[in-house]
Amino acid sequence: MAFNVTILTIFPEMFPGFLNYSLAGKALEKKIWNLEVINIRSFAKDKHSTVDDVPYGGGAGMVMRSDVVGDAVDSMLSVHKNTKFIYMTPSGTKFNQNIARELLEFPHITILCGRFEGIDQRIIDAYTPYELSIGDYILSGGEPAAMVVLDACIRLLPGVVNNTDSITEESFNYGGGVLEYPQYTRPEQWKGYKVPEVLLSGNHKKISDWRQKQSHVITKKRRPELLSGEINDKFT
């Protein structure tokens, strides 16, 4: 069964964007995943296609209107009643590899991409989307964040990556969720740097032990919370 995605955005021309290239693009051509893009501006109430307004209580920026966004959501739900509805927001649960895997369990997901100062809170209250963040920083809109989420999901789909070992041995999958070990290829020497001898030995046990040790060292140095389990890795 294909992985089906609907995007709600005021910039439909941004999609599929970089998802139209490389592995994700080929998978889209093969219909391993399907993309539908809905233009929120189509549900605007005036001739200027206005989707935002000033915030009640004052403050900087503009807020996306609940009536406009709500009509777009209602239109989507009339077709995709069992979709998993997601809203990209910096205040959401931080996205990770486990969430990417769990998203694939849903036959259809919908991602709402905000702009300006975000969406009217009543959209969240009325539809209770799963609020998702890709990190502790601010983008101009939810579209790039949505593409990041989708790229992480798509590459896990069967038939997208030819060599499945490429997935199982990379960061957050390898060795119980730690960071990946260093990789080397030809030439054996470059600018005075040599490939570690163990990787040239042909001894698979020693190579495996070296890689596990390197993964542990790198993870302990850069992401110790992955070793301690102090990370929210569940999609709820």
UniProtKB/Swiss-Prot annotation:
EC number(s) recorded for this UniProt protein: 2.1.1.228
Keywords (A to Z) from UniProt: Cytoplasm, Methyltransferase, S-adenosyl-L-methionine, Transferase, tRNA processing
Gene behind this protein: trmD
Function: Specifically methylates guanosine-37 in various tRNAs.
InterPro entries from the UniProt entry: Alpha/beta_knot_MTases, tRNA_m1G_MeTrfase_C_sf, tRNA_m1G_MeTrfase_TrmD, tRNA_m1G_MTases_N, tRNA_MeTrfase_TRMD/TRM10
GO BP field: tRNA N1-guanine methylation
Family: Belongs to the RNA methyltransferase TrmD family.
Example of a GO cellular component annotation carried by this entry: cytosol
Subcellular location field: Cytoplasm
The protein's name in its UniProt record: tRNA (guanine-N(1)-)-methyltransferase
Enzyme class: transferase
Species of provenance: Wolbachia sp. subsp. Drosophila simulans (strain wRi)
Subunit structure: Homodimer.
Recorded GO MF terms: tRNA (guanine(37)-N1)-methyltransferase activity
